[in-house]
Curated annotation (Swiss-Prot):
Pathway: Carbohydrate biosynthesis; 3-deoxy-D-manno-octulosonate biosynthesis; 3-deoxy-D-manno-octulosonate from D-ribulose 5-phosphate: step 2/3; Bacterial outer membrane biogenesis; lipopolysaccharide biosynthesis. The gene is kdsA. Belongs to the KdsA family. It is found in: Cytoplasm. GO terms for cellular component: cytoplasm. InterPro entries: Aldolase_TIM (IPR013785), DAHP1/KDSA (IPR006218), KDO8P_synthase (IPR006269). This is 2-dehydro-3-deoxyphosphooctonate aldolase. The lineage of its organism: Bacteria, Pseudomonadati, Pseudomonadota, Gammaproteobacteria, Legionellales.
Length: 280
């Protein structure tokens, strides 16, 4: 299934596209700098790009952790990025988010992994009519996403993506099963792989999550070789000082060489026709 986002199409057999940006809006300056650099990199690589940043991280480990600037200031900043840099925007929404207000600004709505089984929420987000990126819960088998997608499609909105972001494996740990990407393709939706949250160690630092950043390229390459429509990566100029998800964010300065590799892998896989639409 092909899906129009801004001025490009995404799909399982289309060239790899990128969703990237900082985990949370820390400041207007940082967001503009990161978005500008990512636009420059993706233009050089001729890679479709959607900028991602959150105005409210509602599921932080601690109530003392930074959540973001809030919806009013956050949407103002995201709208500036969109208009100034002319890039499409994706941001996550929650059960208490005024959805139409967000949908009026961004190009894609994203549902958090923890909320993928909340039927009313999924239907409400899909009913906005915008493209939706549904993140698969860490607790969910990949074949269960067919039912989640069906809930969204029931609203009449077929512009649905599904995003793999790892599986809970014991306490404070996630693993990635690349077979899941082939299974998720059976939904007929564009499949996204979240290479940075997949290396997260949820709650690993007690009051915050840890992460194994060094494995981001390993999983990103593996997922691209397995066959995906897009790659999702949170990035920051100085991940060790990021206000959210720093341990699993990929350094902005290292984005271009990694994306160059992923682009070449994607070409090999798709030109050879390796993307099975069924696991049968």
């Amino acid at each position: 299934m092909l899906m129009q986002i801004a001025d490009f199409e995404i799909g399982l057999n289309n060239p790899l596209f990128l969703i990237a940006g900082p985990c949370v809006i820390e400041s207007e300056a940082l967001v503009m700098d990161v978005a500008g650099e990512l636009k420059s990199i993706t233009q050089q690589l001729d890679m479709p790009f959607i900028f991602k940043a959150s105005f409210d991280k509602a599921n932080r480990s601690s109530h003392l952790s930074y959540r973001g600037p809030g919806i009013e200031k956050g949407l103002t900043i995201l709208e500036k990025v969109k208009k100034t840099l002319e890039v499409p925007i994706i941001t996550d929404v929650h059960e208490d988010t005024p959805l139409q207000e967000v949908a009026a600004v961004v190009d894609v709505l994203q549902t958090p992994a923890f909320l993928c089984r909340q039927s009313n929420f999924i239907r409400s987000v899909a009913a906005c009519g915008k493209p939706v990126n549904i993140k698969k819960g860490q607790f969910l088998a990949p074949w269960e996403m067919k039912q989640v997608v069906a809930k969204a499609w029931a609203t009449g909105n077929k512009k649905i993506m599904v995003c793999e972001r790892g599986y809970s494996f014991g306490y404070n740990n996630l693993i990635s099963d690349m077979r899941a990407l082939a299974i998720l393709r059976e939904t007929a939706c564009p499949v996204i792989f979240d290479a940075t949250h997949s290396v997260q160690l949820p709650g690993g630092h007690g009051t915050s999550s840890g992460g194994q950043r060094k494995f981001v390229p390993v999983l990103a390459r593996a997922a691209t070789a397995a066959g995906i429509a897009g790659i999702f990566m949170e990035t920051h100029p100085d991940p060790d000082r990021a206000l959210s998800d720093g341990p699993n964010s990929w350094p902005l300065a290292k984005m271009q060489p990694l994306l160059e590799t992923l682009k070449e892998l994607d070409k090999v896989v798709k030109n050879a026709g390796f993307l099975e639409q069924s696991s049968e």
